[in-house]
Amino acid sequence: MKFNDVYNKHHKIIHHLLKKYNISYNYDEYYQLLLIKMWQLSQIYKPSSNQSLSSFLFMRLNFYLIDLFRQQKRLNDIILCENHSPILTEQPTYFNEYDLRLQDVCALLNHRERQWLMLYLEGYKQYEIADIMSLSTSTIKLIKASVKRKCQRFFK
């Protein structure tokens, strides 16, 4: 399917997401980033998958927009940290608690479990993760249960 067709049918998803998150400042910049992401997603979409193109785009664009918000928050935190630094020549260090905990959890996991967790956090569905990792869905369920057990032990 050509991108012009995808755009004509699904461009309202971008407007909906921007309205959903009350984006008025930098609306055009966010719109352009989401439009580029829509083009990328239209290139990787497989019509044979169980998910319709509109739900695929909506879900992935929604997660992408949330990631953009997180990146913007990190940038603002870094700028604030730099402005309040006692010595301006000293490079401020930024620690995100989420990233630090994720690193600690990943240290407990084997390669398959780490790969599953990263794909899961990126928003992939179970059957998509199974395709990407070339495993059966039952194996993915076992990996998920193992990660869940390890995380529960870690956070107790």
Curated annotation (Swiss-Prot):
- As annotated in the record, motif Polymerase core binding runs over 29-44
One GO term (biological process): DNA-templated transcription initiation
Q: What is the lineage of its organism?
A: Bacteria, Bacillati, Bacillota, Bacilli, Bacillales
| Keyword set includes Transcription | yes
What are the annotated disulfide bridges?
none
Q: Which organism is it from?
A: Staphylococcus aureus (strain MRSA252)
Q: Which family does it belong to?
A: Belongs to the sigma-70 factor family.
Where's the DNA-binding part?
A: 126-145
Residues passing through the membrane, by range: none
Q: Does the keyword Iron apply?
A: no
InterPro entries associated with the record:
RNA_pol_sigma-70_dom (IPR014284), RNA_pol_sigma70_r2 (IPR007627), RNA_pol_sigma_r2 (IPR013325), Sig_transdc_resp-reg_C-effctor (IPR016032), Tscrpt_reg_LuxR_C (IPR000792), WH-like_DNA-bd_sf (IPR036388)
One Pfam entry name: GerE
How is this protein named in the record? RNA polymerase sigma factor SigS
What does it do? Sigma factors are initiation factors that promote the attachment of RNA polymerase to specific initiation sites and are then released. Sigma-S contributes to the protection against external stress, thus playing a role in cellular fitness and survival.
Q: Which UniProt keywords apply?
A: DNA-binding, Sigma factor, Transcription, Transcription regulation
Which molecular function terms from Gene Ontology are attached?
Answer: DNA binding; sigma factor activity
